[in-house]
């Protein structure tokens, strides 16, 4: 998820015209402020103006930070079947812990790994957050092989979290946080992967608030294999009779949003008889998109890294969700996060929502921790993020 090429592209094109659905204005925006022919720069909010279909002629003279205030127009029927509502279906938080102790299997509950605190989840729930992505390790759930029986203790603990979240009316995303691997080796047996998902889905088939995430951040894998693993998961889930649930599919190269439209184009071929596929992407705002630094590249980087994914979703008639995002507790990152979320909000015809990375009881002073009441991310960002809840 390196950002070098992207950064140079935007630097070179800073004075060029913005493309279809691209950003063209907003507080702190230093990129293009005019649009290609057939599109007009329309004010969405103080942070974001967007090139939307219109008849305004292109112009090459505009101040770099000018906010354009013309009337917003709807996307054409040829590219989308619905206009953006400006309201997310889901907005929430990742919950980490069940996947901790990587490489130590099975590990001990309370020593190598833990499960989310349902009390702090309810604290977030009371503020409007309505989706929680809960990580777990496949090696702990099925210790012997992908097709083997469940570890009952681990499944029981996971199920307790599922029931607590969904009984509150929120959605829970079951996230095998395995990077397309099992015991460190790339999963290549698609039949076994299908069976794994058929077995998992059978346990939650009657709970429509459960969302199945095929696997966290496939990376450095054959692209066709990533397609086939996702399709096998979909097929297994539906074969279990789990027909009411959404399925989040992830892409190669850490499912990065900024490179999605050049890396994961083949995933448009995924099929689901229930038509409930949502494309999950992740995006961080530091120099290499890794989410390992408190520093963000710029106040505009959030939008810059997501526009290509937005265009891909719309062009292919797909729905997306930003399954992980975060930024450091500083003003530059806050502006970048705000711009990112405003872009998603302006494009809710294709973006269903977003989830912050991450809450969880063991984060301590982790730079992005969203664990109430004192997590660094929670204390700095909660007042902003909760304004985006449905």
Curated annotation (Swiss-Prot):
Query: Per its UniProt record, what InterPro entries does this chain match?
Result: CBD_sf, Cellulose-bd_dom_fun, Glyco_hydro_5, Glycoside_hydrolase_SF
Catalytic EC class = hydrolase
**Sorted alphabetically, which Gene3D superfamilies does this protein's record hold?**
Glycosidases (3.20.20.80)
Signal sequence span is 1-16
EC number annotated for this UniProt entry:
3.2.1.4
Q: Which residues form the CBM1 domain?
A: 17-52
- Per the UniProt entry, the glycosylated residues are 157, 261
Q: Main subcellular localization, coarse class? A: secreted
Q: By its UniProt entry, which SMART domains does this protein fall under?
A: fCBD (SM00236)
Q: Which GO terms describe its biological process?
A: glucan catabolic process
Task: List keywords of the entry alphabetically.
Answer: Glycoprotein, Glycosidase, Hydrolase, Secreted, Signal
List the record's Gene Ontology CC terms alphabetically. Answer: extracellular region
Catalytic activities: Endohydrolysis of (1->4)-beta-D-glucosidic linkages in cellulose, lichenin and cereal beta-D-glucans
Q: Describe the PTM.
A: N-glycosylated.
What Pfam families does its record include? CBM_1 (PF00734), Cellulase (PF00150)
Compartmental location: Secreted
- Which GO MF terms are attached to this record? cellulase activity; cellulose binding
Family stated for the protein in its record: Belongs to the glycosyl hydrolase 5 (cellulase A) family.
Q: What else is known?
A: The biological conversion of cellulose to glucose generally requires three types of hydrolytic enzymes: (1) Endoglucanases which cut internal beta-1,4-glucosidic bonds; (2) Exocellobiohydrolases that cut the disaccharide cellobiose from the non-reducing end of the cellulose polymer chain; (3) Beta-1,4-glucosidases which hydrolyze the cellobiose and other short cello-oligosaccharides to glucose.
What function does this protein fulfil? Answer: Endoglucanase that plays an important role in biomass degradation. Binds onto plant cell walls to participate in the hydrolysis of cellulose.
Protein name from the UniProt record: Endoglucanase gh5-1
What broad taxonomic lineage does this protein's source fall under?
Eukaryota, Fungi, Dikarya, Ascomycota, Pezizomycotina
Its gene name is gh5-1
């Amino acid at each position: 998820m390196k950002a070098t090429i992207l950064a140079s592209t935007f630097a070179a094109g800073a004075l060029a015209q913005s493309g279809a659905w691209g950003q063209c204005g907003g507080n702190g925006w230093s990129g293009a402020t005019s649009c290609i022919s057939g599109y007009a720069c329309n004010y969405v909010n103080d942070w974001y103006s967007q090139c939307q279909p219109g008849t305004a002629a292109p112009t090459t003279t505009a101040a770099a930070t000018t906010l354009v205030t013309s009337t917003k127009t709807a996307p054409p029927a040829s590219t989308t079947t619905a206009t953006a509502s400006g309201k997310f279906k889901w907005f929430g938080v990742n919950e980490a812990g069940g996947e901790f102790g990587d490489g130590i299997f099975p590990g001990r509950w309370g020593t190598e790994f833990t499960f989310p605190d349902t009390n702090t989840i309810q604290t977030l729930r009371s503020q409007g957050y309505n989706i929680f992505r809960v990580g777990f390790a496949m090696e702990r759930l099925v210790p012997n092989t992908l097709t083997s029986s469940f570890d009952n203790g681990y499944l029981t603990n996971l199920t307790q979290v599922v029931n607590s979240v969904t009984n509150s009316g929120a959605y829970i995303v079951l996230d095998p946080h395995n990077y397309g691997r099992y015991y460190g080796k790339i999963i290549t047996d698609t039949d076994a992967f299908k069976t794994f998902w058929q077995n998992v889905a059978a346990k939650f088939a009657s709970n429509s608030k459960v969302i199945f995430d095929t696997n966290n951040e496939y990376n450095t894998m054959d692209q066709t294999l990533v397609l086939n693993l996702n399709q096998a998961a979909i097929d297994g889930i539906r074969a279990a009779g789990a027909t009411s649930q959404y399925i989040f599919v992830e892409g190669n190269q850490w499912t990065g949003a900024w490179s999605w439209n050049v890396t994961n184009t083949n995933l448009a071929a995924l099929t689901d008889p229930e038509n409930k596929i949502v494309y999950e992407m992740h995006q961080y705002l530091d120099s290499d998109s890794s989410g390992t630094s408190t520093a963000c590249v710029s106040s505009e980087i959030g939008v810059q890294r997501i526009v290509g994914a937005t265009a891909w979703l719309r062009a292919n008639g797909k729905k997306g969700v930003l399954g992980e995002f975060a930024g450091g507790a500083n003003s530059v990152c806050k502006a970048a996060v705000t711009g990112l979320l405003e872009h998603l909000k302006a494009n809710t015809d294709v973006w269903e929502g977003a989830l912050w990375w991450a809450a969880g009881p063991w984060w301590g002073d982790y730079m992005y921790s969203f664990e109430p009441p004192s997590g660094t991310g929670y204390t700095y960002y909660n007042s902003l993020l909760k304004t985006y809840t449905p």
